[in-house]
Design a protein with these regions (language model features):
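Conserved N-terminal glycine-rich FAD pyrophosphate-binding loop of Rossmann-like flavoproteins
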Residues: 40-63, 93-95, 99-105
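Glycine-rich loop(s) and the adjacent beta-strand/alpha-helix scaffold that form part
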Residues: 25-28, 32-34, 39-55, 255, ...
Length: 573
């Protein structure tokens, strides 16, 4: 028999970026908030010995235990899905702070085109992709989202500079970035020169890695980045990379109205008479069940888990690819990476770096170029970054290099700091056969069905990937002093084995119409107005940018909706 705990104003499932933002804003407004986190407590002090590439970079010390909960995967609706038991394609964060601890800090706003992609694409190109692609407007515009982007970027102390194509895209800013860009480097200047000679308009990556000492509007301090090269897959021991642990969570804690209960795995959302009443969870140390009543429930865990909890709790209609009916699980999207590596006799100090130390361009991103003769929509940014080459994970070798023995070692040593990659990150558009559902066979450690991922790259993806890959090769060839280039392979079937990105989106999409979305534009569930679902699952597609800035902006907008609902008790749609 589950023990019933004292009721709270708001309970969040998860204590990462979204849960932390919700907690900070609601506790400042006087509400009592409890976050249920299935991992353990951690803080900046836990990362003093984080420079262990084997433990964290290779064996994923900050990530979810796939033996207890994971997803199953198949390529198409007729296939057999099997469990994802070792982290590969994407890395699911664990513990307080979630993926916001091990991210790199790339902090891009989505384009105005992204939020109205169905309408704007149809106006310019008609039904170019056909009916199998389920493009959908988000129900908000860039203008609606801009104030929330501004808030998140000031929370993170973003270091950046204006995008030279911002005016063309209609991507205005109400204020400049809080800090100047990170240091420029010899390597990045080499890329910038080649990109400009290719008629690309370059700018520095917006980085949630602090250029200098910074105090955000909530009074939380960020230290200057040390360019130590241990950002992605690692926590920041300097407190220079913005994360929930050094921004929103301590702010929420300072109010005295916020509690985090760790080792608490939520298994069900409870409901009665059209409302949710709280959640059921298991203490993972004792396996004892508890019921946490709440006036408002906020799903703020990773997008896979948010979708799974709605499904196992029978809230919303499961998407059916055969009929096209239902919205829960619909429009799962990912991203594509492509690129070309250039090799030099000249050395670059690539052993130093930062998570978002880079230069990029948007000339072939979004709808910034004419797609009339192309077999795809949207695009990708073309960039180069100096994250820091680490000895185990970094092994750049030119074509034809030995792959074994003394000559292999010699080639590894020589090329370690003599390579520059020109990369691309491509948008992912929704397809009717890419979706999330519950697996009928496999269960997690608590007896609940695993979430099933049905996904493969599409003809749209392959055409975009080839186009951008060729563009990266053109830029790489133009770099001064280049000796040879190695162009990446064109896209094949999706594989969950090699790492690609932790930019999973969709499944709990937002919109202005309940027939095409799970939540409204304040992320309030259509079927239960005291339930809010926030995260990258709200995206109707994925852009050519990283998702975190948009996730943070949506979380700030969601908190406004929660406060409005708390006062009125009514739907916000």
């Amino acid at each position: 028999m589950a023990e019933v705990l004292k009721k709270v104003d708001v309970v969040t499932v998860g204590a990462g970026w979204t849960g932390g933002i919700v907690a900070a804003e609601l506790t400042k407004a006087g509400l009592n908030v409890l976050s249920l986190e299935r991992g353990h407590m951690q803080s900046t002090e836990n990362f003093n010995y984080i420079h262990d590439e084997w433990r964290y970079g290779i064996n994923y010390g900050l990530m979810q235990d796939c033996s207890k909960d994971t997803v199953t995967f198949r390529h198409d609706p007729s296939g057999l899905a099997l469990p994802y038991r070792k982290m590969g394609s994407f890395l699911l964060g664990n513990n307080v702070g979630g993926a916001g601890v091990h991210w790199n800090g790339w902090t891009f706003r989505f384009m105005p085109y992204d939020f109205e992609i169905q309408t704007l694409s149809k106006q310019r190109y008609g039904n170019k992709l056909g009916n199998d692609y389920t493009l959908q407007d988000w129900g908000v515009t860039y203008k609606d989202m801009e104030p929330y982007y501004d808030r998140f970027e000031k929370t993170c102390g973003v270091s950046g500079e204006p995008n030279p194509l911002a005016e063309k895209m209609g991507a205005f800013r109400s204020s400049p970035y809080p800090q100047e860009p990170l240091e420029n480097t010899k390597m990045l200047k080499r890329f910038e020169s080649a990109a400009k000679s290719s008629n690309l308009h370059t700018y520095r990556l917006p980085a949630s890695n602090s250029k200098g000492g910074y105090t955000n509007p909530d009074g939380q301090d960020l230290a200057p980045c040390q360019y130590c090269a241990y950002c992605e897959r690692f926590g920041c021991e300097y407190g220079a990379k913005a994360s929930p642990l050094n921004t929103v969570i301590p702010k929420a804690m300072s109010t005295g109205k916020y509690t985090i209960r760790t080792y608490s795995n939520v298994t069900q959302i409870l409901k009665k008479d059209g409302k949710v009443t709280g959640v059921k969870f298991v203490d993972t140390r004792t396996m004892k069940e508890y019921i946490q009543p709440a006036d408002i429930v906020v799903l703020a865990s990773y997008m896979f888990n948010n979708a799974k909890l709605l499904m196992v709790s029978n809230i919303g209609e499961q998407y059916d690819p055969k009929t096209g009916k239902g919205t829960l699980g619909r429009n799962y999207c990912y991203q594509m990476n492509m690129g070309t590596t250039a090799f030099f006799d000249e050395q670059f100090n690539t052993f130093m770096g930062s998570g978002a130390l880079g230069t990029t361009s948007d000339d072939f991103n979004g709808d910034n170029f004419d797609h009339s003769k192309e077999k795809f929509l949207h695009g990708a940014m073309i960039y180069s970054v100096q994250l820091g080459t680490r000895p185990i994970q970094s092994a750049p070798l030119p074509a034809g290099a030995p792959t074994w023995g003394a000559e292999f070692k010699k080639a590894l040593n020589y090329n370690f700091t003599r390579a520059i990659t020109v990369g691309g990150q491509g948008a992912s558009l929704p397809h009717k056969n890419n979706y999330l559902s519950l697996d009928p066979t496999y269960k997690d450690a608590f007896g609940m069905p695993l979430l099933r991922l049905t996904y493969n790259f599409t003809d749209q993806d392959r055409a975009l990937h080839k186009f951008i890959t060729d563009k990266t090769a053109e830029v790489a060839k133009r770099m001064q002093g280049v000796k040879s280039i190695k162009k990446g392979a064109y896209l094949k079937d999706y594989s969950v084995v090699p790492y690609q990105s932790t930019h999973n989106t969709g499944g709990t999409t937002m919109g202005a119409d309940r027939e095409t979305s799970v939540v409204n534009t304040y992320l309030q569930h259509w079927d239960a107005d005291n339930l809010f679902v926030v995260g990258a699952g709200n995206f109707q597609h994925n852009s050519g940018y990283n998702p975190t800035d948009t996730v943070g902006a949506l979380a700030y907008r969601c908190t406004e909706g929660i406060l409005k609902y708390h006062k009125s008790g009514k739907s916000l749609a």
